[in-house]
A protein has these predicted regions:
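HIT superfamily nucleotide-processing domains
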Residues: 1-117
Length: 117
């Protein structure tokens, strides 16, 4: 697992830490769910790792499983589990990753299109 330098970690941490813990809609031992500040769908949630991990490439399998379970629970909580939703993990520059702190996008509430990119 690769953690970021202290300077970069502080910069990244501020992106997700500006929201108070009371704004977390769900939580597990190692991750939490927030509503996205810049939604790309009627429902756009972020499942964020509590530990600052740069990309999915550096994440332990157990954490990824826990985060996907939390994404599934978030979809149920927001009633998009039956109509359908999309899960996205942007990884590195060409994958569209803008914040280098592991997070999963959960998007729903409308018909998704393909191809997505």
């Amino acid at each position: 697992m690769l953690l970021l330098s202290d300077a970069y970690a502080s910069e990244v941490e501020s992106v997700f830490s500006k929201k108070p813990k009371s704004s977390w809609v769900l939580e597990s031992e190692n991750a939490y769910v927030l509503e996205d500040k810049y939604p790309q769908a009627p429902i756009h949630l972020l499942v964020v790792s509590k530990e600052i991990i740069q990309t999915v490439n550096h994440a332990p399998s157990a954490l990824l499983g826990e985060m996907l379970e939390l994404a599934k629970k978030a979809a149920q909580k927001y009633n998009i589990d039956k109509s359908g939703f999309r899960i996205v993990i942007n990884t590195n520059k060409e994958g569209g990753q803008g914040v280098y702190h592991l997070h999963i996008h959960v998007l729903g509430g409308r018909q998704m299109q393909w191809p997505p990119g």
